[in-house]
Amino acid sequence: MDSSILDFVVVGAGMAGASVAWQLARDGGASVLVLERESQPGYHSTGRSAALYEEHYGPLQVQALTRASRAFYEQPPQGFVQAPILAPRGVLYVGTAAQKDLLDAAHAEALLHSPQARRLGPDELKALVPCLNTTLLVDGFADDGARDIDVHGLHQGFLRGLRQCGGELRCSAEVRALAQDGGVWTVDLADGSQVRARCVVNAAGAWADALGALAGAAPIGLVPKRRSAFTFAVPDGMDAGHWPAVISADEGFYFKPDAGQLLGSPANADPVAPQDVAPEELDVATGIWRIEEVTTLQIRRPSHTWAGLRSFVADGEMAIGWDASPVPLPGFFWVAAQGGYGIQSAFGYSLLARNLLRGEPLDARLAAQGVQPERLSPARCQRG
């Protein structure tokens, strides 16, 4: 066996690439290299996420992958992280009288897996979050099971674990070409070097279709969507540290405590080309207006603004599995289209990717939550 040929090259060192690489390397049975185009891992979507662990957020398979992740997040392996991955937060969905039907549907869905989700009236809403204008927001429900996620800690845990298991991360390593011959992929990098591997894992985030095109794969129809966010000061005299995340019934805004401030967003999803995305002033202004309209908060000037990309295929589920182009590419594997759910479900989808990549049976933790690999296969995107 040629020792210069790796088992797996993972392209992309965001949460998807880091978690899958760790899963592949964790028992020491495979050689794994992660290639990251940027000078640091997690620069794009992962590093800009306002992640919340919420089991009834996203389409059904995302919810299943999220539920399958909880036990790992609550009790990771010894030494995986230096601080807890999850911290108590809770979530509060709020709505006007006209949004009762939306809240009814969301509450019913939440109860399927979060029996603690409870409906609240105006007085109860205001008791939880005193800044709410309960003349307008008259209905809602709370789920105390939602958690804040230490995104950086989780991401670094996967990368540290990868290195401890003999894997390697190489930054400033842009892929320029991909070619397969005799069951081996040759990956040409921008610095003129080459890497050879039996399998390429496409975890390139918003650039996953572009990487697929370099390999000759049919596109999965990935659409990156910009979401803007901002932080702002908590009003004098208010203690917001214990507030839940507040989300409007129509997902027109959200805000939550964040490191001594409040973090807000218009929850926009604007289709854009893959890029180092920046916030639009109109997005931020819209978010501020929507939050101020239904609260007593006055956001005179955000302390920080940013934007991130959330990438989707048509049905909103992820694309995880072997290439299924009309002429499939052997050894080319997709881990893409995480949408806005790639942090909360990272352990689940990376475990699924490991099972598929290594030809293992579906892990019992995934099966128990109703994960169905065929519903996540790129085949549904590449073949229509």
What are these regions (language model features)?
Residues 2-16, 33:
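Beta1/beta-strand and adjacent pyrophosphate-binding region of the FAD-binding site
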Residues 25-46:
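Glycine-rich FAD pyrophosphate-binding loop
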Residues 50-128, 252-253:
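Dinucleotide-binding Rossmann-like beta1-alpha1 core, especially the glycine-rich loop
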Residues 82-93, 106-107, 113, 119-122, ...:
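Helix-loop-beta segment of a Rossmann-like dinucleotide-binding subdomain
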Residues 142-191, 195-198:
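Helical element adjacent to the flavin cofactor pocket in flavoenzyme catalytic cores
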Residues 193-242:
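Central helical "cap/lid" subdomain
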Residues 218-221, 234-331:
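Active-site lid/adjacent beta-loop-alpha segment flanking the redox-cofactor pocket in flavoenzymes
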Residues 293-384:
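C-terminal catalytic lobe of FAD-dependent flavoproteins
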